[in-house]
C-alpha cells in the first residue's frame, strides 16, 4: 500500500500537470475543463483574505488565476488587535462565499492541494508553516514571511529539506509601475532607486515588517541582491533607510506615518530618471501566486526574500545604534545561528 504522503504528492503533481497542459482553457476552468487546484487559507484575519478569495473564485477568472480555487479556510488568529478584532468578520465573509471553514490546520491540509498562509501576525508564521511544509503542500506566505529573520531562514530551510515550493512577497513588487521600470530600456540600467510608502508598526516584530515591507520589497525588485549595509534615521512621523549596495549603488526607502503617504518609486538610470506610482491591485500578485502553484516555480528567490528581511532587521539595529551603518553580513550571521539552533531542536 502506498504511503498517504506519497499519494498526496502524486495527486498534487497530477493536478499541476493537468492544469499546465490545459492552460489555454483555464479561463473557463470554473465552468468546465480541468479541475482547479484546491487552495486552503490559513489565518482569516486580514483584508487580503476576502480580496484574494474574490479574485481566485471569480467565475470569469482567466489564465493562472483560474487554475486555483479557494475551497477551505482555517480562521486562526492571535491576541494582536489587528487579528482578534477582524478574524470573525473575515471568516464569515468567506463562509458567505461558500468556502468551508475548518477548525484546525491538519484537517485543512487533508482537503487542499496548496496553501496561502495569510495570518496578519507574522510571529506565528513559522509554527503555521511547519505542518504545511511537512505535508508537502506548495506554500505562499503573505507578508511578512515571518516574525523574525531567523524564523524566515528556518521556513526556507525546511521547505528546501522537504522539497516544497515556497515563496513570499508584497503585492507592490508586481504592480504595473514597478514592472514597467524593470523593463524600461531607456533608463540605461538602474544605478540607484528610491521608494516610499506608509510605514505603521506592529508590536512584537521589527518596525518595517508590518507595512514598511510594501516599500522595501519594490526597492529590492529594482536594485536586486547585494545590499551590504544599512543606515536609518527615525523621527516621530518618518523613517528614512539608506542601503549601500556593492559597486557603490545606493537605494533608499522613506516610510511615512503622517501626511500624504502614497506608494511610489524612482529609478535612477544611466540615461534617464523615471518615477512611478503604485498602480493596479491584488490581481497581479494573485496571478503570480496562481502561476507559482501551477508550475512550482517561485517568482522571488528565497535568497532575495531573506536579504530583504536582513535589510529590515539591520534598519532596526541601526536605530538602536543611533543611526550607525549596520552590516547585513553581521545581521545574517546572527540570524543563521539562531535559525540553526531552532532547526536542531
Predicted segments, located by residue:
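Bacterial N-terminal signal peptides that target proteins for export
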Residues: 1-18
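A contiguous active-site-proximal alpha/beta segment in oxidoreductase catalytic domains
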Residues: 145-205
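C-terminal helix-rich "cap/oligomerization" subdomain common to oxidoreductases
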Residues: 32-33, 115-116, 294-345
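Short helix/strand-capping hinge loops at secondary-structure junctions
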Residues: 136-138, 143-144
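C-terminal substrate-binding/catalytic lobe of Rossmann-fold NAD(P)-dependent oxidoreductases
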Residues: 241-287
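N-terminal glycine-/serine-/threonine-rich beta1-alpha1-beta2 phosphate-ribose binding loop
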Residues: 14, 22, 31-135, 157-161, ...
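Rossmann-like dinucleotide-binding domain that binds NAD(P)(H)
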Residues: 193-260, 303-310
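Hydrophobic residues in well-ordered beta-strands that form the structural core
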Residues: 103, 141, 166-168
Amino acid at each position: 500500500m502506498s504511503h498517504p504522503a506519497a499519494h498526496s504528492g502524486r495527486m498534487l503533481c497530477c493536478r499541476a500537470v493537468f492544469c499546465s497542459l490545459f492552460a489555454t482553457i483555464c479561463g473557463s476552468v470554473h465552468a468546465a475543463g480541468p479541475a482547479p487546484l484546491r487552495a486552503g487559507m490559513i489565518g482569516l484575519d486580514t483584508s487580503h483574505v476576502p480580496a484574494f478569495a474574490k479574485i481566485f473564485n471569480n467565475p470569469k477568472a482567466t489564465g493562472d488565476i483560474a487554475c486555483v480555487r479557494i475551497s477551505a479556510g482555517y480562521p486562526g488568529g492571535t491576541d494582536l488587535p489587528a487579528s482578534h478584532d477582524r478574524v470573525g468578520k473575515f471568516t464569515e465573509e468567506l463562509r458567505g462565499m461558500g468556502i468551508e471553514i475548518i477548525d484546525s490546520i491538519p484537517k485543512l491540509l487533508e482537503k487542499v492541494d496548496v496553501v496561502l498562509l495569510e495570518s496578519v501576525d507574522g510571529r506565528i508564521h513559522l509554527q503555521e508553516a511547519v505542518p504545511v511544509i511537512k505535508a508537502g503542500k506548495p506554500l505562499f506566505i503573505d507578508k511578512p514571511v515571518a516574525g523574525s529573520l531567523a524564523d524566515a531562514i528556518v521556513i526556507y530551510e525546511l521547505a528546501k529539506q522537504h522539497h516544497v515550493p515556497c515563496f513570499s512577497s508584497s503585492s507592490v513588487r508586481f504592480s504595473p509601475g514597478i514592472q514597467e521600470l524593470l523593463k524600461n530600456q531607456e533608463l540605461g540600467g538602474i544605478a540607484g532607486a528610491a521608494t516610499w510608502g506608509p510605514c505603521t508598526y506592529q508590536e512584537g516584530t521589527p518596525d518595517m515588517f508590518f507595512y514598511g515591507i510594501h516599500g522595501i520589497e519594490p526597492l529590492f525588485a529594482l536594485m536586486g541582491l547585494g545590499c551590504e549595509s544599512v543606515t536609518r534615521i527615525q523621527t516621530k512621523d518618518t523613517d528614512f533607510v539608506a542601503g549601500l549596495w556593492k559597486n557603490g549603488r545606493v537605494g533608499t526607502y522613506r516610510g511615512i506615518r503622517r501626511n500624504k503617504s502614497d506608494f511610489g518609486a524612482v529609478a535612477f538610470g544611466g540615461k534617464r530618471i523615471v518615477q512611478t506610482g503604485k498602480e493596479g491591485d491584488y490581481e497581479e500578485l494573485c496571478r503570480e501566486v496562481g502561476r507559482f502553484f501551477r508550475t512550482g516555480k517561485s517568482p522571488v528567490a528565497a535568497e532575495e526574500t531573506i536579504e530583504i528581511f536582513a535589510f529590515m532587521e539591520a534598519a532596526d539595529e541601526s536605530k538602536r545604534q543611533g543611526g550607525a551603518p549596520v552590516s547585513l553580513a553581521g545581521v545574517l550571521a546572527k540570524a543563521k545561528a539562531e535559525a540553526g539552533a531552532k532547526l536542531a531542536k
